[in-house]
Amino acid sequence: MKVLVTGANGFVGRNLCAHLAERGGIEVVPFTRESSVGNLPELIRSVDFIFHLAGVNRPEKPEEFKIGNSELTYALCEAVRSNGRAIPLLYTSSIQAEVDNEYGLSKRAAEEHLQVLGEDIGCPVYIFRLPNVFGKWSRPNYNSAVATFCHNIIRDIPIQINNSSAEITLVYIDDVVRTFMKVMDGKLSNAVSLQVEPQYQISVGELAEQLYEFRNSRKSLTTARVGSGLTRALYSTYLSFLPEDSFSYDVPMHSDPRGTFVEMLKTADSGQFSFFTAHPGVTRGGHYHHSKTEKFLVIKGMARFKFRNILTGAFYEICTNGEKAEIVETVPGWTHDITNVGTDDMVVMLWANEVFDRENPDTYACSVGEGA
């Protein structure tokens, strides 16, 4: 399959082309700012689908709106018309097409050229009036406020907010690309106007607050709920703006004669992740909890866990090592300890169901002793 992508070097174009390359069996024919409009008839000569993403939204001169949007689209329509084949065509318009400003008028005129083309030769035309698109490879001070805010906040550059309560509608680049590829695959209806879902609404102030939370998480170690929805998309976008020299950061490390203890990640309501080491023969723990629980995973070395019920005196012992993927849980009301019974340093991953609170640690020293 051969696909023409106009605006292939733009924000949406780069993401789309990356996904098309992953698919395999698709040859991308790129059209960029360096390409000649006069070459369009040759470029589309044998293509099976057209993604028309090229356009102008922040020109140096107002007349460039018309040149880069409506006139370019008209030239593309003429090339398709002269080709004689009903090549399916997808166009990225804008919600600004509903507004009577120079940008909106130029995008609406482009839509009209495409609609006429579809009526004249019967080619499927898919028009997406996109709101603010955000994601990796977007340009600050050009594509969206999200890009600008991410770029600045991650570099400690002040951002400007004129109206913090102003609402903006966002769509994530991966959702845009996934929807576009469904159209190419014939999995969406042959409608003239389509939408990318989901769409997110957020105020400018809330957006900035969320991005600052991402920045501060490196110091607090507390991560937001970045696994789904808008927060996931914003976090991925935020990280895509990291300069290379900021790809890593230090976390607290506490060392003593027993070994080291490192806090890695905290959550608002699902506990925290850490790891610790212990030298041969070293025992850690010797305490119990009323409500706090933990999961231990030995990554390296040999460990002996001992447990004693503080009420009944019942005793239990578990031995495990780094060769086994085995979780050992601590149980409320059972005092417990862990001993390195090997000859090398032991490394253990640890999850606790709550973030450590120095004022209320729910940790009470109590020797485990030995079993009967």
UniProtKB/Swiss-Prot annotation:
Top-level lineage group: Bacteria
**GO process annotations (BP):** O antigen biosynthetic process
Q: Is-annotated flag, keyword Plastid?
A: no
SUPFAM superfamilies in the cross-refs: NAD(P)-binding Rossmann-fold domains (SSF51735), RmlC-like cupins (SSF51182)
What is its pathway? Bacterial outer membrane biogenesis; LPS O-antigen biosynthesis
Q: EC number(s)?
A: 1.1.1.367
Q: Which EC class, in a word?
A: oxidoreductase
Annotated substrate binding sites: N132, H279, P280, G281, V282
**Any Pfam family the entry gives:** Polysacc_synt_C
Q: How activity varies with pH?
A: Optimum pH is 9.
| Catalytic activity line of the entry | UDP-2-acetamido-2,6-dideoxy-beta-L-arabino-hex-4-ulose + NADH + H(+) = UDP-2-acetamido-2,6-dideoxy-beta-L-talose + NAD(+); UDP-2-acetamido-2,6-dideoxy-beta-L-arabino-hex-4-ulose + NADPH + H(+) = UDP-2-acetamido-2,6-dideoxy-beta-L-talose + NADP(+)
Is Kinase set as a keyword in this record?
no
InterPro entries annotated for this entry? CapF_C (IPR029303), Epimerase_deHydtase (IPR001509), Lipid_A_modif_metabolic_enz (IPR050177), NAD(P)-bd_dom_sf (IPR036291), RmlC-like_jellyroll (IPR014710), RmlC_Cupin_sf (IPR011051)
Where NAD(+) binds, per the record, is at 7-30, 53, 103, 107
Q: Which family does it belong to?
A: Belongs to the NAD(P)-dependent epimerase/dehydratase family.
NCBIfam families in the cross-refs: UDPAcbARedWbcJ
Q: Summarize subunit and interaction data from the UniProt record for this chain.
A: Homodimer.
Protein name, per record = UDP-2-acetamido-2,6-beta-L-arabino-hexul-4-ose reductase
Provide the species name. Pseudomonas aeruginosa (strain ATCC 29260 / BCRC 12902 / CIP 102967 / NCIMB 11965 / PA103)
